[in-house]
Swiss-Prot record:
Transmembrane segments: none annotated. Belongs to the chaperonin (HSP60) family. Keywords: ATP-binding, Chaperone, Cytoplasm, Isomerase, Nucleotide-binding. Forms a cylinder of 14 subunits composed of two heptameric rings stacked back-to-back. Interacts with the co-chaperonin GroES. Its EC number is 5.6.1.7. This is Chaperonin GroEL 1. NCBIfam families: GroEL (TIGR02348), PRK00013.1 (NF000592), PRK12849.1 (NF009487), PRK12850.1 (NF009488), PRK12851.1 (NF009489). The gene is groEL1. Residues 530-541 have a biased composition (Gly residues). It is found in: Cytoplasm.
């Protein structure tokens, strides 16, 4: 394919136009009074969204050079979303300002390389200062971060905080579309897997068709059990103690299963058999997880361990086990042991090392089950358009909350960046020439998010920034008041701010040091009738297939024969 080339100021000018086109579409969404963007779809109703990445991915510009600029800014939004889950519009606003100021200075003769060095030094200092300013998050602060990220929706904030409280930070929290109008939180407590009882005769509650035991012992093995002789020692032990026994094995069958059922129905034993979850190596990993969770030992063929020699100390313990026809849920005791923490850390290391999405999904599931459960936020809304928009907001809020727990919180509304910008004055004094100019570009860029939040709320951005500096308080765009944002619960996750700033300067520094842009030459328009012309003319072209042997026979079934 032929290529188009653009050089120097012309190339940078085209890139800047693309940057501005995309950034201007995104920045109207920032802040509590950010506006929506309507996106036409080829099929179905238009989407009404408030999510930066979703908007960015929909934009393709006609000019190929401008489109490259737009796609570079889309990359900023996507990278920030991928790593932090939120802050995409903040990153875009920062990048746009840095690009505009950087290109203005290079056009005036500044060295783009020295500008970049100055900008990178400034961002490095801001990141260090941000870490010092961050505060750990807990309690109500979790709800406040989620509420702010959800556009001020307190219902969503409370729901996310409740979900994290119930399943812990390591637990899995997913967002799904609901079939009802209401948005609800559904929590599965404990470790659940999709294997039920081996026989319906193990049922303890005839009305609900479940088998449920309080404080049972659990025998965990990857063996197939056919002979009751293998189980007699452990059965005698639990019978003396009077505790229920769950046998979790690859399979319990034949004589062993029949004997267990008979003794259960006679009231001699409180017992149930369950097939082990998953298959192959994943089964061994799952059984190992259950052993760690319950404080038991996995009786494994790989370790040459024998069922006849099982001791009471080898059995796992749980607070409650509920078994249905298709699933089993183990609610562990509250005591969190070191072995469990180490197991979770080990799985997290595996997660970092794998690139397979399937493996990542399964590893995350294992972490969640060990950590205490799974929470599902089921999103409801009157229309499909509102449902999609609400789902995106909840996902952003959930991601921002996780980021806040990881690296702490700071005052929101762009105020923290504004405060940190004041510390760049000393750095600028230590530098000279274009590096100093680069620092000053970052210092001014850090005011851009606050200005845009104010503009979207109907205020003058420059006046708001000036008032914040004068009063020493943050700006609540929802009410138009100047308050202590930490006390008011208007918070941002430090991780989100850090990544937004780092991703913005990364792309901006690349853009201002660009000298040549290469783009694909657009395809010439199709000749009339070749595409999109008379539909029957197009059918005529198919007539050429008549010469293809057997296909020619199908020609007899053509339009003339049907007349």
């Amino acid at each position: 394919m032929a290529k188009l080339l653009s050089f120097s100021d012309e190339s940078r000018g085209a890139l800047e136009k693309g940057v501005n086109n995309l950034a201007n579409a995104l920045k109207v969404t920032i802040g509590p009074k950010g506006r929506n963007v309507v996106i036409e779809k080829k099929f179905g109703a238009p989407d009404i969204v408030n999510d930066g990445v979703t908007i960015a991915k929909e934009i393709d510009l006609e000019d190929p050079f401008e489109n490259i600029g737009a796609k570079l800014i889309e990359q900023v939004a996507s990278k920030t979303k991928e790593k932090a889950g939120d802050g995409t519009t903040t990153a875009t606003v920062l990048a746009q300002f840095m690009v505009q100021e950087g290109l203005r200075n290079t056009a005036a003769g500044a060295s783009p390389i020295e500008l970049r060095r100055g900008m990178e030094k400034a961002v490095a200092q801001i990141v260090d200062d941000l870490k010092k300013k961050s505060k750990s998050v807990s309690g109500d602060a979790i709800k406040q971060v989620a509420t702010v990220s959800a556009g001020g929706d307190e219902e969503i904030g409370s729901m996310i905080a409740d979900a994290i409280d119930k399943v812990s930070f390591d637990g899995v929290i997913t967002v799904e579309e609901s079939k009802s109008l209401a948005t609800e939180l559904d929590i599965t407590e404990g470790m659940a897997f999709d294997r039920g009882y081996s026989s319906p005769y193990f049922v303890t509650d005839e009305d609900r068709l479940i088998c449920e035991f309080e404080n049972p012992s659990i025998l965990i093995t990857d063996k197939k059990i056919s002979s009751i002789a293998d189980l007699i020692p452990v059965l005698e032990t639990v019978q003396k103690n009077g505790t229920p026994l769950i046998i979790l094995a690859e399979e319990v069958e034949g004589e062993a299963l029949a004997t267990l059922v008979v003794n259960k129905n006679r009231g001699v034993l409180q017992v149930a058999a369950v097939r082990a979850p998953s298959f192959g190596e994943r089964r061994k990993a799952a059984l190992g997880d259950i052993a760690v969770l319950t404080g038991g030992t996995l009786i494994s063929e790989d370790k040459a361990m024998s069922l006849e020699k099982v001791q009471i100390s080898d059995l796992g313990q749980a607070r409650r086990v509920t078994i249905t026809k298709d699933s089993t849920t183990i609610v562990a005791n509250d005591n969190q042991n070191t072995e469990l923490s180490n197991r979770i850390a080990s799985i997290k290391r595996e997660l970092d090392e794998t690139d397979s999405e399937y493996d990542q999904e399964k590893l995350n599931e294992r972490i969640a089950k060990l950590a205490g459960g799974v929470a599902v936020i089921k999103v409801g809304a009157p229309t499909e358009t509102e449902l999609k928009n609400r789902k995106l907001r909840i996902e952003d809020a959930l991601n921002a909350t996780r980021a806040a727990i990881e690296e702490g919180i700071v005052a929101g509304g762009g105020t923290t960046l504004l405060e940190l910008s004041e510390g760049l004055g000393d750095l600028a004094k230590k530098l000279e020439g274009d590096q100093k100019t680069g620092v000053e570009i970052i210092k001014r860029a850090l005011t851009a998010p606050t200005k845009q939040i104010a503009i979207n709320a109907g205020f003058n951005g420059d006046v708001v920034v000036s008032d914040i500096k004068r009063l020493g308080k943050g700006f609540n765009a929802q009410t138009g008041e100047y308050v202590d944002l930490l006390e008011a619960g208007i918070l941002d996750a430090s991780k989100v701010i850090r990544l937004a700033l780092q991703d913005a300067v990364s792309i901006a520094s690349l853009l201002i040091t660009t000298e040549v842009v290469i783009a694909d030459k657009p395809e010439p328009p199709s000749a009339p009738g070749a595409e999109g012309g008379d539909p029957m003319g197009g059918m005529g072209g198919m007539g050429g297939m008549g010469g293809m042997g057997g296909m020619g026979g199908m020609g007899g079934m053509g339009m003339p024969g049907m007349m």
